[in-house]
Amino acid sequence: SDGKDEIVVGTRADQLHAINDNGTNVPGFPVAFGGDVNGSPAIGDVDNNGDLEIVVNIGNGTVVALHHTGATMWTRFIPNANFFAPSPALGNVTGDAKLETFIPSSNGSLYGLSDTGADLPGFPVVYSTTTYTESSPVIADIDADGLLDIVLGSEEKYIWAWNRNGVVLAGFPLSTGDAMRGVPTITDLDQDGS
């Protein structure tokens, strides 16, 4: 609450750092985990209490949400899954003013987690039976129905899109003809309002 931004970054040395503008550690950091911190941390007010939380994926198949103090909010282990490059995405998909977490895993499934780390209804969803993705999900209202959707690129040459209930949107998956490792960008490029 000093009006200055901090830098939050994970390392291959199993730690999450939060660093002040003068190079010192934020109190409570670094936080140590039992695996590499992969991808970028996602930051938002997950529980709608006015404070920011941090959500990270750990290379051992764990998703962790932390309070801004570094204390653990919740931990969720995903069986048979190791996380690689993808970063979690946060969004108020259910409309309850709290943020849900979406993260793809190496077992070919996209997980949707509530503000407490529990599975959302309709999740996980399968995006691949043969491979994983290095892409991160994006949350946007791509069908212009006023509700947020989840979009993910895959190594199997498809772009997937699901609604908040885990139902694949009409017209998806879309074939791109090649694997995707980057994160999709969502915009109204033709400015037609959808």
Language-model region placement:
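Extracytoplasmic/lumenal domain signature
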Residues: 1-194
